[in-house]
């Protein structure tokens, strides 16, 4: 029965419970497991930690046979409890897991039977290790760090934001994790932002339990490091080098690493060169001609290995090649540093907000309330091409 100022205010009528065995509704182990699988629930709201057990439960119910009881809300379906929860924090679990609902491409579901280049090079923890070793990158040219300041809130991914993670049909977010065969959109990446992007948060707005101070590196710091590899085939080495050899006309590609990628931090340019080691020569001579250690290293061209990988790509079927080209196009759009020079770039790639109910203009502004209204994200190419040439 609705009442009060808003539809969120309700009156409830409570009746004495019927504890007789004939009135009980079974709860399956699967439903209980779904409830326990909620990893983001506050521990203080966990029904299983609030329950009465043993003698306390028997006294509460008035039945010596009862050893567990906890008041809760529930939904009955086909004579069984379909889901249960706690007051305003009631959560209805999705009926599918990510793998069972058709959200993953078949190739990923059958990944255990397929070894791709990522598996072959980086390893698969259950079966074999990586053939790469990432060394620490050492600071070579320092520009210092920014003064410590509270950053804009850096939240974790929220599964309930299905409009961001699942492909939607049209402009409305009608497909969620309970929708069968609603595919995941792809890999999550963040747009680059100009060096003056406002990552700081007003100190009057920070929350102790959410926000903290950070000290980002200033632009222009230079680091040097190595990625060591061993026993890679020409094609595998070409696949690895492809990451550092992405190129396109009129583009300057940068990558994203570290914390704060969503608030404009973490953009880096990588200048790579290939150095090969002749191990046999290294064993033959201890010292080099200049008297130093014989490292048996020589700088080599990447072209031979890149061509070996490109030749494999050229053998893809029409559908697979179209999918590969589409992913490469999206990647180039997302990594292009020159995009920050486009007109209205910061406005077109800004963080979505909930809007402020305290501000009448914001409370009804669909643009400001994009996140609350479950605005469906455009594709990377749509965002990039909108400002092309501006």
Descriptions of predicted regions:
Residues 1-390:
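Basic, Gly/Ser/Thr-rich N-terminal segments that form RNA-phosphate-binding interfaces in CRISPR RAMP
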């Amino acid at each position: 029965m609705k009442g009060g100022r808003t539809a969120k205010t309700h009156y409830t009528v409570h009746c004495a419970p019927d504890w007789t065995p004939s009135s009980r509704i079974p709860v399956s182990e699967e439903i209980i497991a779904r409830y326990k699988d909620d990893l983001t629930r506050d521990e203080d709201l966990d029904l299983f930690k609030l329950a009465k057990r043993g003698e306390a439960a028997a006294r509460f119910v008035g039945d010596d046979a009862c050893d567990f009881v906890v008041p809760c809300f529930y939904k009955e379906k086909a004579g069984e409890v379909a889901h249960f929860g706690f007051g305003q924090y009631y959560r209805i679990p999705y009926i599918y897991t990510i793998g069972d609902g058709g959200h993953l491409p078949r190739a990923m579901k059958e990944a255990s039977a397929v070894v791709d280049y990522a598996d072959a090079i980086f390893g698969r923890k259950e079966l074999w290790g990586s053939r790469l070793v990432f060394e620490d990158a050492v600071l070579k040219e320092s520009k210092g760090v920014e003064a410590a300041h509270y950053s804009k809130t850096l939240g974790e991914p929220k599964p309930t934001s299905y409009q961001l993670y699942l492909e939607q049909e049209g402009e409305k977010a009608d497909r969620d994790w309970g929708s069968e065969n609603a595919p995941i959109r792809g890999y999550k990446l963040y747009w680059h932002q100009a060096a003056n992007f406002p990552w700081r948060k007003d100190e009057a707005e920070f929350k102790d339990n959410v926000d903290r101070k950070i000290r980002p590196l200033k632009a222009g710091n230079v680091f040097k490091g190595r990625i060591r590899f061993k026993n890679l085939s020409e094609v595998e080495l070409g696949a690895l080098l492809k990451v550092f050899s992405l190129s396109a006309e009129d583009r300057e590609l940068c990558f994203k690493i570290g914390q704060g990628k969503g608030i404009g931090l973490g953009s880096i340019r990588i200048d790579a060169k290939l150095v090969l080691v002749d191990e046999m020569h290294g064993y033959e001579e201890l010292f080099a001609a200049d008297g130093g250690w014989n490292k048996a290293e020589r700088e080599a061209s990447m072209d031979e290995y890149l061509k070996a990988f490109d030749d494999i790509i050229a053998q893809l079927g029409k559908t697979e090649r179209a999918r590969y080209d589409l992913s490469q196009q999206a990647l180039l759009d997302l990594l292009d540093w020159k995009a920050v020079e486009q007109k209205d770039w910061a406005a077109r790639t800004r963080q979505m907000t909930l809007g402020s109910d305290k501000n009448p203009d914001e409370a009804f502004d669909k643009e400001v309330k994009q996140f609350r209204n479950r605005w469906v994200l455009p594709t990377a190419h749509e965002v990039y091409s909108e400002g092309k040439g501006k």
